[in-house]
Swiss-Prot record:
It is a single-pass membrane protein. Keywords: Endosome, Membrane, Phosphoprotein, Protein transport, Transmembrane, Transmembrane helix, Transport. Residues 53-69 have a biased composition (Low complexity). Residues 43-69, 94-113 are annotated as: Disordered. Acts as a component of the retriever complex. The retriever complex is a heterotrimeric complex related to retromer cargo-selective complex (CSC) and essential for retromer-independent retrieval and recycling of numerous cargos such as integrin alpha-5/beta-1 (ITGA5:ITGB1). The recruitment of the retriever complex to the endosomal membrane involves CCC and WASH complexes. The gene is VPS35L. This is VPS35 endosomal protein-sorting factor-like. It comes from Pongo abelii (Sumatran orangutan).
Length: 963
């Protein structure tokens, strides 16, 4: 291609801005406006005549601001009209019926405020473990009865099933001995799966045999420490069985015509379902032993709904009385817990049965301290303090069920009944664990009196105080009692010798102290914790509790100047000597500071303490630290840095940033934040001085610039460095530090060749060229206003950058280099204008320095021609079939650049634009719609006074036709 000279179009930026500005249109009152709120007319209709085909109505209208979506209703909501015309009496009746139904449902359904059994299950399994050997009886499946004829009479079938049941009870089982706890759990899981498999294969009798076998296991207390966990595992199987039976009977009530509603009555169930249900209850009634008969019947208690409305209410008292036949108090209380659990699931409104269970339990409570239990404990070698903690899971659950939405009078009666019993620490603990926190808190002094009277031997008092403290963390006691409560509790807590007992109790009461008292009392508590946990390095075994103490303290002390003035707070942190734990605590502290610190601070106490905390977090970073962890630590440290401000003392602020850089050099995001902060500091200085720096402030901003220039090379991210060089150079330029700005821009230019082909973005490798293009476009926008250095040639920075772009190894089949050259052409065109588009205050750009000098313009045009030659050469290489679409796109892009920035009165440039137009359409690859819009734009521009030459150009630009 021939060489084409470049001639830039003279631009009048003010006139162009004026022509692009939207025309202001005066708006009369009441005219439509797109931002005006929509008003909808609401019609209130009153029905006058109910009979006959016509009715008269009276309406009143009012305007109101409503949701824009309501505008589609054209005034009146049809549902509102329907409601307005409804019969008031019918509406009232419907409302009353709905309210009664809702009240009934509220009583029959347990709300979300009731803690479900599933939440306690995992805790019980984790807490009650054993290393002793266990035994279990496994059902050995018999083939007897599996094959039968379909012609057997109903009585024969029943007799056969009962015989199978007898066969199981008479010894079709195998006892496995010397099982570890895990083996035992695995066997139970196998039984659960066997139950499901038998049910799925329609072997209902086998399923029942498995359940009976499992329901015998609660009677075995040979390894008593494991009993609560055994109970959980066995009741899981019972729950599965109950669910399978219920769903089976429920499915019998569903036919092709109707579906049984959730709240159905026995009348909705068909005869087949009722007969099957009775059959199950009769089978269970034939179980000879009390405990398995009780558990299996309780598991299918819900099935009574198919038989009668009063079935459940009649069965629950009977099952409650059955438990009286269980002699072992531990087995008995867990049976009551299971009955209460089933009762709450199927009939939570039947409170009388729950209460009866509780009062029956109180009558047998003395058995716990009787000779039978004591002899059993001696045989197993279990002490009473180890035996009593087996009861709370069951007792807590019974108490929770009874106290749920219970009236104050019942709770008071229960409390008084417990008070009358001797050795009632166990009961008292369950009362405090299950009753509402508000009930406990208002009677705190009464409970403290009861705790004092308890016998220490069976159940330690510190556990009772811990339970009381848990309630006081949720509800406030009377204000007049608060100090006395703390004193009474702490007298007991501080006397504890065992560090674990002490810290478990102290951790709970710290929250009460923080909530109701000042830093003085909190400091006393922290000092006492340090005193107890420091000897023999006891803190090493109690890091979770110590962490909770810190979290509770910082949750209540949002003012860090108050928090850090607590004398023992920092010594308390010194107990966290395990690095991972110490870092977690530091993260909690910094997170609280970022959330709650409202104003920037310069308090030296806060700064010194939190710098130490941040330094601890930073020093934990090593080669194995995950990126997510580094990101989190950087976020916390950056949050602290942003909240430090020394006001107008900018030098002190810079000193803080210098110190921070030395402390946090291993976290790149922190260094980036420091660079941004220092740049902002320089700009704040400029703002204070209104751009007129004194000798002192000029030296200060140069120090800020030097800080950034020194810090940026230590960063790893290539584009992070490039963007910071550019940003810092702009700040230097704004503060009239011209030589420093040149240094930043030169550093950025010298860094471009180091940009790799692929970069890691969020863990994925991506091509870097698009990011490089974006950076260079931003760079070009800055270079427009950078003045030339007097000791260097014209446009020396642009020339250096062009050389780097030329030498950079671009991807094959990539057009990014040409897009960059096109942007360079835009830059050079803007540089040739008499007055530039924008300037920096008190910085003379090249338009002022050269004043439109012909030599400068000639150099500029020569660079333009060089760039144009590169673009045209590249277009020439795209003449292959597979690259024609790229050639068309780039050709049209270059055409638009010439149209926007070139002087098309020059014949050669004009002819080049025509050639590019034809090139874009030559092979049918151009987007016709884009070409049409471009041509329309040219014709529109040609109507402007200084653009009439575009009329002739438009005539020479034909649109391609498709045949």
């Amino acid at each position: 291609m021939a060489v084409f000279p470049w001639h830039s179009r003279n631009r009048n930026y003010k006139a162009e801005f004026a022509s692009c500005r939207l025309e202001a249109v005066p708006l009369e009152f009441g005219d439509y406006h797109p931002l005006k709120p929509i008003t909808v007319t609401e019609s209130k209709t009153k029905k006058v005549n109910r009979k006959g085909s016509t009715s008269s109505t009276s309406s009143s209208s009012s305007s109101s601001v409503v949701d824009p979506l309501s505008s589609v209703l054209d005034g009146t909501d049809p549902l509102s009209m329907f409601a307005a015309t409804a019969d008031p009496a019918a509406l009232a009746a419907a409302t009353d019926s709905s309210r009664k139904k809702r009240d009934r449902d509220d009583n029959s359904i347990v709300g979300s405020d009731f803690e479900p059994w599933a939440n306690k299950r995992g805790e019980i399994l984790a807490r009650y473990t054993t290393t002793e050997k266990l035994s279990i009886n496994l059902f050995m499946g018999s083939e007897k009865g599996k094959a039968g004829t379909a012609t057997l009479a109903m009585s024969e079938k029943v007799r056969t099933r009962l015989e199978e049941l007898d066969d199981f009870e008479e010894g079709s089982q195998k006892e496995l001995l010397n099982l570890t706890q895990q083996d035992y759990v695995n066997r139970i899981e196998e039984l659960n799966q066997s139950l499901k498999d038998a049910w799925a294969s329609d072997q209902k009798v086998k399923a029942l045999k498995i359940v009976i076998q499992c329901s015998k296991l609660p009677s075995d207390t040979s390894v008593i420490q494991f009993y609560p966990s055994k109970f959980v595992l066995i009741t899981d199987i019972l729950d599965t069985f109950g669910k399978l039976v219920y769903e089976r009977i429920f499915s019998m009530c569903v036919d092709n015509r109707s579906v049984l509603p959730d709240h159905f009555s026995p009348e909705n169930a068909n005869d087949t379902a009722k007969e099957t249900c009775l059959n199950w209850f009769f089978k269970i009634a034939s179980i000879r032993e009390l405990i398995p008969r009780f558990y299996v019947e309780a598991s299918i208690l819900k099935c009574n709904k198919f038989l009668s409305k009063t079935g459940i209410s009649e069965c629950l008292p009977r099952l409650t009385c059955m438990i009286r036949g269980i002699g072992d108090p531990l087995v008995s209380v867990y049976a009551r817990a299971y009955l209460c659990r089933v009762g709450m699931e199927v009939a939570p409104h039947l409170k009388e049965t729950l209460n009866k269970n509780f009062f029956d339990f109180l009558l047998t409570f003395k058995q716990i301290h009787g000779d039978t239990v004591q002899n059993q404990l001696v045989v197993q070698g279990v002490e009473l303090p180890s035996y009593l903690p087996l009861y709370p899971p069951a007792m807590d659950w019974i108490f929770q069920c009874i106290s749920y939405h219970a009236p104050e009078a019942l709770l008071t009666e229960m409390m008084e009944r417990c008070k009358k019993l001797g050795n009632n620490a166990l009961l008292l603990n369950s009362v405090m664990s299950a009753f509402r926190a508000e009930f406990i808190a208002t009677r705190s002094m009464d409970f403290i009196g009861m705790i004092k009277e308890c016998d220490e031997s069976g159940f330690p008092k510190h556990l009772l105080f811990r339970s009381l403290g848990l309630n006081l963390a949720l509800a406030d006691p009377p204000e007049s009692d608060r100090l006395q409560i703390l004193n009474e509790a702490w007298k007991v807590i501080t006397k504890l010798k065992n560090p674990q007992d002490y810290i478990n109790c102290a951790e709970v009461w710290v929250e009460y102290t923080c909530k109701h008292f000042t830093k003085r009392e909190v400091n006393t508590v922290l000092a006492d914790v340090i005193k107890h946990m420091t000897p023999d390095r006891a803190f090493e075994d109690s890091y979770p509790q110590l962490q909770l103490i810190i979290k509770k303290v910082i949750a209540h002390f949002h003012d860090f100047s108050v928090l850090l003035s607590v004398e023992k707070f920092l010594p308390f942190l010194d107990m966290f000597q395990k690095e991972s734990v110490r870092v977690e605590v530091c993260k909690c502290i910094m997170d609280a500071f970022i959330k709650h610190q409202q104003e920037p601070t310069k308090d030296p106490v806060i700064l010194n303490a939190l710098l130490h905390v941040c330094k601890t977090m930073h020093d934990s970073v090593n080669a194995l630290t995950l990126e997510d962890e580094k990101r989190m630590l950087s976020y916390l440290i950056n949050g602290f840095i942003k909240m430090v401000s020394f006001g107008r003392d900018f030098e002190q602020q810079l000193s803080f940033y210098v110190e921070s850089r030395s402390m946090f050099c291993n976290l790149e995001p922190v260094l980036v934040q420091l660079i941004h902060s220092v740049n902002r500091l320089a700009m704040e200085t400029r703002k204070v001085m209104k751009g007129n720096h004194s000798r002192k402030t000029a030296a200060f901003v140069r120090a800020c610039v030097a800080y950034c220039f020194i810090t940026i090379p230590s960063l790893v991210g290539i584009f992070t460095r490039l963007n910071l060089y550019l940003h810092s150079g702009q700040v230097a330029l704004a503060n009239q530090c011209l030589s420093q700005a040149d240094a930043f821009f030169k550093a950025a230019i010298s860094l471009v060749p180091e940009v790799p082909k692929m970069i890691n973005i969020d863990g994925k490798m991506r091509p870097s060229e698009s990011f490089l293009l974006e950076f260079l476009c931003n760079f070009f926008s800055t270079l427009l206003i950078v003045p030339d250095h007097p000791e260097h040639g014209v446009l020396f920075l642009v020339r250096e950058l062009l050389n780097v772009i030329q030498d950079y190894t671009w991807e094959d089949n990539s057009d990014e280099k040409i897009r960059i050259y096109t942007c360079v052409l835009h830059l050079l065109s803007a540089m040739s204008q008499e007055t530039y588009l924008y300037h920096i205050d008190k910085v003379d750009s090249n338009d002022s320095l050269y004043g439109g000098d012909s030599k400068f313009l000639a150099e500029n045009n020569k660079l333009c021609e060089t760039v144009m030659a590169q673009i045209l050469e590249h277009l020439k290489t795209l003449a292959k079939d597979e690259a024609l679409k790229r050639q068309s796109s780039l050709g049209l892009s270059f055409f638009n650049s010439i149209l926007a920035h070139g002087d098309l009165r020059n014949n050669k440039l004009n002819q080049l634009s025509v050639n590019l137009w034809h090139l874009a359409q030559r092979h049918g690859c151009a987007d016709t719609r884009t070409m049409v819009k471009t041509l329309e734009y040219i014709k529109k521009q040609s109507k402007q006074p200084d653009m009439t030459h575009l009329t002739e150009l438009a005539l020479r630009l034909p649109l391609q036709t498709r045949t």
